Design a protein with these regions (language model features):
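Helix-to-loop junction immediately C-terminal to a conserved catalytic motif
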Residues: 32-35, 40-72
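Short, glycine/polar-rich helix-capping loops at beta-to-alpha or helix-loop-helix junctions
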Residues: 36, 100-104, 176-178
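A generic structural signal for well-ordered alpha-helical segments
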Residues: 44, 86, 107-108, 132, ...
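Glycine-rich, highly charged phosphate/nucleotide-binding loops
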Residues: 49-54, 119-126
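Short acidic-hydrophobic, aromatic-tinged amphipathic segments that line or gate anion-handling sites
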Residues: 53-54, 114-117, 188-189
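Catalytic core of membrane glycerolipid acyltransferases/transacylases, capturing the structured
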Residues: 60-120
Length: 211
């Protein structure tokens, strides 16, 4: 038997580390963000409509974590809410992954938004949202999931509770030649997932139908 030393077996490749809350949040470029908000408002202007914003006194000042939950009625919703926010609040929406195509996906990412897989429990997107909140950012979510949805998902309350951030309800509706965005009083995330989700549903229904 040979005394030659056999080479050590090739080590198995290590499994990539799973993302943690300590990783960096998606970056918002303020100049590109402002450009995206301005450009995406053009369809509203060109159609002869205008944006009517109400309840801005309910929006907490910048520098604090915030979750904005809005009803979903059109493809313009994220941009209408972003434009309605006071200066200094950069809205980072959880957008469906199907939108992240080569061109429009770049635009969305430039604004700091990030994809979510609506087919199941997307743990990665939740962790990304928590990173944004940890850095005192603003996460935007459509709790109905799709346009015109009637059932709210509990993910908003879960993210707000884990991120220790209030939920700012935003009602969106169209009235003739106006898009109306109405912010309501912030909702505390401490009441339990079901209770907070129910309260949010009541507020969104009220704000989206307000006169």
């Amino acid at each position: 038997m040979s005394d030659a030393r056999r080479p050590d077996p090739t080590p198995a490749p290590s499994t990539p580390a799973r993302p943690t809350v300590d990783e960096a949040a998606p970056v918002v470029n303020p100049h590109m963000y402002a450009l995206v908000v301005a450009v995406t408002y053009l369809p509203v202007l060109l159609s002869g409509m205008k944006l009517d914003v109400r309840g801005t006194e309910h929006v907490p000042p910048p520098g604090t974590p915030l979750v904005i939950a809005a009803n979903h009625v059109s493809g313009l919703d994220p941009f209408l809410v972003a434009r309605a926010l006071p200066r200094g609040r950069f809205l980072q929406f959880m957008a469906k992954k199907e939108l992240f195509l080569p061109v429009i996906g770049w635009i969305i990412r430039t604004g700091g938004s990030f994809p979510v897989d609506r087919s199941g429990n997307d743990v990665a997107s939740i962790r990304t949202a928590l990173r944004v909140l940890k850095e005192n950012g603003t996460v935007g979510i459509f709790p109905e999931g799709t346009r015109g949805g009637t059932e709210l998902h509990g993910g908003v309350a879960l993210i707000a509770a884990k991120g220790r951030a209030p939920i700012l309800p935003a009602g969106i509706r169209r009235d003739g030649r106006r898009w109306i965005v109405t912010f309501g009083p912030p909702i505390s995330p401490k009441g339990g997932i079901k209770a907070v989700t129910a309260e949010l549903g009541t507020e969104l229904a009220r704000l989206s139908q307000a006169g």
